[in-house]
């Protein structure tokens, strides 16, 4: 299964490192990623705040799962947008994420 991991921090590096160990992982894309995540998968130059571009990328690459790490994109509805586009996403919806973001 191909996965899109959204974020660029240490949390995302740890998630990417662990995902890379899975035999079920196909291609791992990280947007925007960092130097550490580049060792685990392919960094993609899309800001984690650019929801339309992230949805378009996930559709284009036909990823099977999107994992949203940072609080800000979650609070701005990235998970909701992915689900509306029929893309499986891991993370809280915008309403639930507001509890952490505020």
Predicted regions and their residues:
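ATP-binding N-terminal substructure of ATP-dependent carboxylate-amine bond-forming enzymes
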Residues: 1-95, 99-100
């Amino acid at each position: 299964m191909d996965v899109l991991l959204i974020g660029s921090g240490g949390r995302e590096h740890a998630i990417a490192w662990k995902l890379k160990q899975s035999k079920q992982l196909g291609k791992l894309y990280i947007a925007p990623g960092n130097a550490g995540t580049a060792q685990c998968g392919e960094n993609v130059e899309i800001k984690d705040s650019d929801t339309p571009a992230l949805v378009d990328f996930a559709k284009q690459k036909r990823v099977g799962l999107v994992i949203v790490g940072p609080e800000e994109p979650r609070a701005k509805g990235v998970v909701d947008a992915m689900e509306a586009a029929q893309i499986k996403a891991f993370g809280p919806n915008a309403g639930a994420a507001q509890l952490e973001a505020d």
